[in-house]
């Protein structure tokens, strides 16, 4: 997590050491990446390889404390949609709204399908429960037909796990 005002999470919370988890919920296997985990494609891929069928990303992200004019909402949204597309599965991204200590959280919670198409979304200051119907069987077929998991080459990925 970056240093600076608005990014003090690492001083109050410790990351868990039991890895990512996938749960059965209402007939679907869900994987959850919390806040900072959302920026790493490895999180999405590991959850997918563990059998997740839907990726959830609850977060609190907004304006940059040192540069209030910098709006990273488009970059955040593209990263989340990238997880959906590269893992061929729906993503549910829930983001905080409001202002605290000078940081404005930009909302824009959304649900997208495995193609990255938006199924439901809120604006910058809207809150509530987004609802959408997901066709998990169609997503499974899509995942199988693209071969992203079948054609992986793990023998080439060792560097990603080494310290820099």
What label would you give each PLM region?
Residues 1-54, 58-59, 63-78, 145-146:
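Active-site catalytic loop in hydrolytic enzyme cores
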Residues 52-57, 89-90, 108:
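Conserved active-site beta-strand-loop modules that form the wall/rim of enzyme catalytic pockets
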Residues 77-81, 90:
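Membrane-associated lipid acylation/remodeling enzymes share a hydrophobic transmembrane-juxtamembrane segment
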Residues 90-164:
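C-terminal beta-strand edge segments of enzyme domains
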């Amino acid at each position: 997590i970056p240093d600076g005002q608005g990014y003090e999470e690492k001083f109050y919370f410790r990351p868990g050491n039991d890895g990512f988890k996938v749960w059965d919920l209402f007939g679907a296997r869900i994987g959850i990446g919390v806040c900072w985990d959302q920026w790493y494609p490895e999180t999405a891929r590991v959850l997918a390889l563990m059998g997740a069928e839907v990726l959830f990303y609850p977060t609190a992200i907004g304006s940059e404390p040192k540069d209030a004019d910098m709006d990273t909402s488009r970059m955040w949204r593209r990263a989340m949609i990238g997880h959906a597309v590269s893992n061929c599965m729906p993503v549910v991204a829930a983001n905080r709204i409001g202002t605290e200590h000078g940081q404005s959280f930009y909302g824009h919670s959304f649900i997208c399908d495995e193609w990255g198409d938006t199924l439901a979304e809120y604006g910058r200051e809207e809150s509530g429960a987004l609802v959408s119907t997901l066709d998990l069987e169609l997503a499974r077929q899509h995942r199988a037909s693209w071969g992203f998991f079948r054609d992986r080459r793990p023998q080439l990925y060792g560097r990603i796990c080494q310290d820099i």
